[in-house]
C-alpha cells in the first residue's frame, strides 16, 4: 500500500468522488453478513468516522477475522457517494492491511458507553474515544490560537525556567528538586540541610509561575508571553486542581490596569471565537453529549462586553442579595466560586472583571493604590467556572515593593534580581495569568479538570 494516506476529515469535508484513496486508522465498529461488511474507521483527524464497505466474497472472510473494535488497519479503495443513510461518503475497499489487532476479550474500549471515571484509569487509551479526541483537538487549536494572537499583537514568546530558586506566589506550595542522597543528606553546623552541596548549590524547586522572569522580558522587549508547564504541590484532590498544568502569562511594559483588562477581554474573545470556528464539530459533539449549555456559554462570552467592577462594589452587591451563600460575605474575603458565579450569571448576566482587591489577599508584586488598603489586581470571571484569569498592574516603585516584601516576611535572598529591575530603568507594566486547562475546561464544557489534559498529575497519581 504505497498510496499517500488521506485524512478522513479532508475526505468528508471536500470529497472528490470516484477516485482511489488510502485511509489508515482505528476500527470503531464492524458489522455485516457473509456477503458484505461495514467498517467504521476513525483516524483521529475528526470526531466523524468514515464507512468502509467490504465485499467479503471478493476479499475473503479470513481477511476480516482480526478486524475488531480497536484494530489498526489501512484501506485502499474507491471513494464514492454513500447509498445508505447516515453518511454521505464511503469507501469501497479493494485492499486491507492489518497493522495491529485488538483482542476483543481484553481490549478495554469496546462499543459501549464508558464513564469518564473509568477512562481516567486508562488514560493511555482514552485519546482514542470520541470524547477525548474532541478534547485533544480543541486543546491543540486553543494552543495554536494563543500563539497566533500574541504574534499578531507583536508580543515575543519568552521562555522562562522550570527550575527556580524563587517562589513567585509566596505560597510555599512547591515541589523541591535535589540530587542529594535523601537517606544521608549533608548537614550544616546548625543541623540544616546543606544545599551548597546540592546540584545547583542552593535550594531549588519546580516553578509555580513564570511571571517574575516574564516581567524581566517585558522590561526589555516591551511585550512578551510565556506558555509552559508549572507545578503546584497543593494536596487538593478536587475536580479543579492539578499538580502539573500549563499557564499562559503575558507581561507588557507601559500597560496600566485598564490596558491589562482590555487585553484580557480581547484575548479571551479571540481564542474562544477561534475555537468555535475551527472546532465546530468537536464542540457540537461535546454540547450534545455532556453539556447542552456549552455553546450558549461560549456565545455568552463573545456577545457581551465584560463589566468592570470594583471589589468593594462587588461585596456590596453580594451583601444586599437574597442569595444564601455557603461562605459568608464581608469586605476582605477572597471570593469563592459561588460568589463569582452569582455576579456573572445572575446579577450582571455577562462576564465580569473585578478590580481593586484588598492587598492582604493578593500577591506582593501588585501595585498598591493610594488608599493603602487595595491593589490594582484583576480577576476575569466567567459563567460556570468563576475565575479564569488573574492579573494586575505590577508594582514598579522600588521602595514600595521592598516595603511590601518586608511586611510579608519574605526572603530577599532570591528576589534581589527582581528588585533590581525597579532600580534600573523601571517602567509601569502589567500582566496576567491564564491556566490553560481552565480555558480548555470552559471551551469543552467538561466538569473535571483531569479530563482536559492528556495525563493528569494529582495527589497519589503520576501514572503514564
From Swiss-Prot:
The domain of life is Bacteria
- Assigned EC number: 6.1.1.22
Keyword entries, A-Z? Aminoacyl-tRNA synthetase, ATP-binding, Cytoplasm, Ligase, Nucleotide-binding, Protein biosynthesis
One GO MF term attached to the UniProt entry: nucleic acid binding
Catalytic activity, as annotated: tRNA(Asn) + L-asparagine + ATP = L-asparaginyl-tRNA(Asn) + AMP + diphosphate + H(+)
**Which residues, if any, are the signal sequence?**
none
For this UniProt entry, what is the primary localization, expressed as one broad class?
cytoplasm
The compartments listed are: Cytoplasm
Q: Which GO terms describe its biological process?
A: asparaginyl-tRNA aminoacylation
**Which GO terms of the cellular component aspect does the record hold?**
cytoplasm
Give the record's subunit note.
Homodimer.
> Family per UniProt?
Belongs to the class-II aminoacyl-tRNA synthetase family.
Q: Which NCBIfam families match?
A: asnS (TIGR00457), PRK03932.1 (NF003037)
What HAMAP family does UniProt report for this protein, alphabetically?
A: Asn_tRNA_synth
Query: What name does this protein carry?
Result: Asparagine--tRNA ligase
Source organism per entry reads Azobacteroides pseudotrichonymphae genomovar. CFP2
Encoding gene per record: asnS
Amino acid at each position: 500500500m504505497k498510496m499517500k494516506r488521506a485524512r478522513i476529515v479532508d475526505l468528508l469535508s471536500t470529497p472528490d468522488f470516484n477516485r482511489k484513496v488510502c485511509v489508515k486508522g482505528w476500527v470503531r465498529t464492524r458489522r455485516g453478513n457473509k456477503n458484505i461488511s461495514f467498517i467504521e474507521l476513525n483516524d483521529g483527524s475528526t470526531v466523524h468516522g468514515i464507512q468502509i464497505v467490504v465485499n467479503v466474497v471478493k476479499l475473503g472472510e479470513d481477511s476480516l477475522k482480526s478486524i475488531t473494535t480497536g484494530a489498526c488497519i489501512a484501506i485502499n479503495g474507491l471513494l464514492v457517494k454513500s447509498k445508505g443513510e447516515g453518511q454521505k461518503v464511503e469507501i469501497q475497499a479493494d485492499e486491507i492491511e492489518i497493522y495491529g489487532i485488538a483482542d476483543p476479550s481484553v481490549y478495554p474500549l469496546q462499543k459501549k458507553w464508558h464513564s469518564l471515571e473509568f477512562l481516567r484509569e486508562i488514560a493511555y487509551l482514552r485519546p482514542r474515544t470520541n470524547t477525548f479526541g474532541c478534547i485533544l483537538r480543541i486543546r491543540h487549536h486553543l494552543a495554536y490560537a494563543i500563539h497566533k494572537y500574541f504574534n499578531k499583537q507583536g508580543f515575543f514568546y519568552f521562555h522562562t525556567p522550570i527550575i527556580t530558586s524563587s517562589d513567585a506566589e509566596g505560597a510555599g506550595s512547591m515541589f523541591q528538586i535535589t540530587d542529594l542522597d535523601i537517606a544521608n543528606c549533608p548537614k550544616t553546623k546548625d543541623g540544616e540541610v546543606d544545599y551548597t552541596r546540592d546540584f545547583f548549590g542552593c535550594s531549588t524547586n519546580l516553578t509555580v509561575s513564570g511571571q517574575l522572569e516574564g516581567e524581566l522580558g517585558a522590561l526589555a522587549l516591551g511585550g512578551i508571553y510565556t506558555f509552559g508547564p508549572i507545578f503546584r504541590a497543593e494536596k487538593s484532590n478536587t475536580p479543579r486542581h492539578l499538580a502539573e498544568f500549563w499557564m499562559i502569562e503575558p507581561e507588557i511594559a507601559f500597560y496600566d490596569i485598564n490596558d491589562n483588562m482590555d487585553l484580557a477581554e480581547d484575548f479571551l474573545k479571540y481564542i474562544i471565537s477561534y475555537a468555535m470556528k475551527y472546532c465546530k464539530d468537536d464542540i457540537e459533539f461535546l454540547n450534545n453529549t455532556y453539556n447542552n449549555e456549552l455553546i450558549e456559554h461560549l456565545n455568552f462570552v463573545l456577545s457581551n462586553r465584560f463589566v468592570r467592577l470594583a471589589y468593594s462594589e462587588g461585596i456590596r452587591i453580594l451583601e444586599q442579595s437574597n442569595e444564601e451563600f455557603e461562605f459568608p460575605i464581608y469586605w476582605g474575603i477572597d471570593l469563592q466560586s459561588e460568589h463569582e458565579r452569582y455576579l456573572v450569571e445572575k446579577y450582571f448576566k455577562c462576564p465580569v472583571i473585578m478590580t481593586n482587591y484588598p492587598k492582604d489577599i493578593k500577591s506582593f508584586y501588585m501595585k498598591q493604590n493610594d488608599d493603602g488598603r487595595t491593589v490594582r489586581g484583576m480577576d476575569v470571571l466567567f459563567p460556570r467556572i468563576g475565575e479564569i484569569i488573574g492579573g494586575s498592574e505590577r508594582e514598579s516603585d522600588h521602595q514600595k515593593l521592598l516595603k511590601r516584601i518586608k511586611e510579608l516576611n519574605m526572603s530577599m535572598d532570591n528576589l534581589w534580581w527582581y528588585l533590581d529591575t525597579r532600580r534600573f530603568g523601571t517602567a509601569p507594566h502589567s500582566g496576567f495569568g491564564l491556566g490553560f486547562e481552565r480555558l480548555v475546561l470552559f471551551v469543552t464544557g467538561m466538569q473535571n479538570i483531569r479530563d482536559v489534559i492528556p495525563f493528569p498529575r494529582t495527589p497519589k497519581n503520576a501514572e503514564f
